[in-house]
Amino acid sequence: MVPSADRTRPVVTDADLDVLREQLGRPARGVVGVAARCVCGRPLVVRTSPRLDDGSPFPTTYYLTSPQAVAGASTLEATGQMVGLTEWVRTEPIAAAYQRAHESYLADRSELGDVPEIAGISAGGMPTRVKCLHALLGHALAAGPGVNPVGDEVLLRLRDTWRPDRCTC
């Protein structure tokens, strides 16, 4: 995986937008940067505006786009792994780390603008539960190891079927 996007150079190219359209099956909305890339250079995660062009608030700052990563997170969700992960994030020191991940997510989003409707709301159920593995995996890929404990755990659980350091595009 290519490290998190250079925040001083958040440009999204036309080629990126073409790949995103292919990955998502629709035009990408609110993209302000590519937050993580596959080793081949294609987007894995995009950074999105907290308010879409139509005025809608959009709390998912880090949106997972890689179809293979999305499928992996979906498989984990379908097998009920969020229940055990929610129990896990209620134990120390994981609870404190998950709270810091929540705060990090909010700080990253605040760099993009203030949207009162979603103030204090991060993504994926943070800071007290696990609701969406896609959002948590996207955050982990964008922020790097050690920031989001659940996203890091999802990466570990996917390692036999999907890894960001191996191209499966």
Mark where each language-model region is:
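Preference for intrinsically disordered or flexible, low-complexity segments
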Residues: V2-C169
